[in-house]
Amino acid sequence: MMADTLILASLSSYRAQLLKKAGLNFLIEGASFDEREIGKIEKVKTPKELSCFLASAKAKNVSDRFPDALVIGCDQVLDLEGQIFHKVTSKKEAYQRLCTLSGKTHSLHSAVALFRNGRKIWVEAFSAHMSVRPLSSKFIKRYLAYVGTDVLNSVGVYQIEGEGIHLFEKIDGDFFTIIGLPLLPLLVKLRHLGIICD
C-alpha cells in the first residue's frame, strides 16, 4: 500500500530483505560514495553524527539522480571507546577485528535518512550496545572458517541473525538497529509522510 516511489540507496541484501518483508515496494540504487574518504570528517564528528552524515550523503547522492523519488539512505558506524571502525576487506582483518572486540562492549550507531529532490526530509541515528564475550583465537578462527566471506559485509564482522550471535554475552538495543536499518522509526516516518497508507 504505497503512495510514492521509494528507492533504497544501498546494495545491502539484508536491508533490502527487511524492507521487502515489511511489505514495501522499492527500487535499489547504490550510492556513488566512498566511505573511506572521510578522514577529515571523522575528526570533527562523533560516531553517531558520522552515521547520520554518511546515511544523508548516500541518500542525497541517489536523490540528486532520481529527484522525484523518496530515497532511503542508511549507514552504520561501529564505535569502540571513541574509535571508529570501517568494514574489513580481508579474513586477516576480520580476525584482527574480532580480537580487538573480544571481551569489550562496543556501540553500533545506525542512521536512516530520507531525501527528496536532493533535500533532507529526515535523518536520525539509533544506537545498540554490544558486549562481546572473551573469544579465544581458536574460536575466532573456527567461526571465520564457518561463516565465510559474508561477514566482510558487516562492520563488526558478525551477522547477528546467524552464527554471529555466539560472539556475545549481552546486547542492549533494537534488532533492526543492529542489522543496520532502524526499521520501526522508518516505518513511523513513512506513515507520517503519507508514503505508507493505513
Swiss-Prot record:
GO biological processes: nucleotide metabolic process
One Pfam family, short name: Maf
GO-annotated cellular components: cytoplasm
Reactions that this protein is recorded to catalyse: N(7)-methyl-GTP + H2O = N(7)-methyl-GMP + diphosphate + H(+)
Protein's UniProt keywords contain Transcription: no
InterPro entries membership: ITPase-like_fam, Maf-like
Single GO term (MF): nucleoside triphosphate diphosphatase activity
EC numbers for this chain: 3.6.1.-
Keywords, alphabetical: Cytoplasm, Hydrolase, Nucleotide metabolism
SUPFAM superfamilies (alphabetical): ITPase-like
Cofactors: a divalent metal cation
Catalytic residues as annotated in Swiss-Prot or TrEMBL: D75
Coiled coil: none
Entry's localization field: Cytoplasm
Function: Nucleoside triphosphate pyrophosphatase that hydrolyzes 7-methyl-GTP (m(7)GTP). May have a dual role in cell division arrest and in preventing the incorporation of modified nucleotides into cellular nucleic acids.
Similarity section: Belongs to the Maf family. YceF subfamily.
Protein name per the record: 7-methyl-GTP pyrophosphatase
